[in-house]
Amino acid sequence: MIRKDQLPNIWNDDWRCAAAPQTVAIGAGSEEKLVLCAADDAPLFMLRDDGPYTVMPDVEHMTVTVAEGAGLCLYRLQGPNTPASHLTQLEVVLQRDAWVRMCTVTLGGGHVRNNVVVRMRGEGGSCVANGLYLMDREQQCDNYIFVEHAQPHCQSGELYKGIVDDAARARFNGHVLVQDGAVKTEAYMTNRNILLTDKAHVDTRPFLEIYNDDVKCSHGSTIGQLDEQAKFYLMTRGISERTAVTMLSYAFCDEVIRSIDIESLRDAVGDMVKKRLHGELTSCADCAIACKNPCNGPNAHFDIDPSKL
């Protein structure tokens, strides 16, 4: 069930801010799917629609408790067209043998910050948290995730990927804490980033804090550019440079997209990412993935559907 402790949206003309506090309780033994979607023309949980260029910030705070043996799939879609600021705070508590699978797809925004806190309060808990962010112009996306392993035999895995274009910025801060009694813990954390211009910037900091030896844990991060050899190979097969860049970018994103369990949602997100890479969802003067400037040639399109490769 979803229990709303307060009004679902709080509006103040002076603050010009929408807030959406919610508490979600998943009963023992049940499995639920929850999709949070920000439309292209409005921020998440907007009380009013100010159009595609609204500057009103919004704040979302959600607390989720997953009871013994229960599970939750939680997906958040953040649209690209608004320069508004978004702040989301998600806190998840897992009881014995409970699990949660999360995926956050950020296709743009002014300044987006996603905070995720997961606490393993019972044995056998499992958490998978994935994220994808595509930023351009002067947009900024910050992802902060904290996972606490407080009980034995729990597992967690985080995979966040980002493509940062133009003068955009992205930050990833991941922290996994393994307490002294949390033996047989398995925890993995990865952050991968592609920079498409020399003005784009990424800060990444995956961090493990472990207080016992009976664990399997790893973490890592990468920041780089598209594979020039792969791009050249595609171009030698008659594919334009623009399309080759778009195809390689989509292939980079596909691992996160495929982690979405709901087939119809997975297909819809895949289509949105393709449109984003085509430049159909946003535009700017000189970015590499979303440029509609005629001097840079026609809009990108796929000669081949990369999802079929």
Features from the language model and the residues they span:
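Conserved beta-strand/loop scaffold segments within soluble protein domains that form the structured core
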Residues: 17-232, 236-239, 260-309
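Short, Gly/Pro- and small/polar-rich lid/capping loops
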Residues: 1-25
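Short arginine-rich
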Residues: 252-262
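Small/polar glycine-rich anion-binding or flexible loop at a beta-alpha turn
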Residues: 248-254, 273
